[in-house]
């Protein structure tokens, strides 16, 4: 499950409740279903409305879910993108629209993060 960018201002507890609801709905019919929870990339840090987003706390909420329930792991894409920017990767090199959508490079970051979590 990969949700979050459009809900970046929601408090982590509301976000967590929504993700848990999806998991519970699916597991009500498929109790052995496993989940990979994917946090989103970072939005453009220069856009004022995005500067106080809840994405770090929401990623923490994904880890809480993984700790509370069996068969769930987290792909911390958000943390990877934060590290890329900290280490001087220009945000415009990460985005397809200069705001919050991934480009080809970013899609590879998503894929590599997910494959790493899966142990590939």
Describe these PLM feature segments.
Residues 1-120:
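Alpha-helical cap/lid subdomain in secreted, periplasmic
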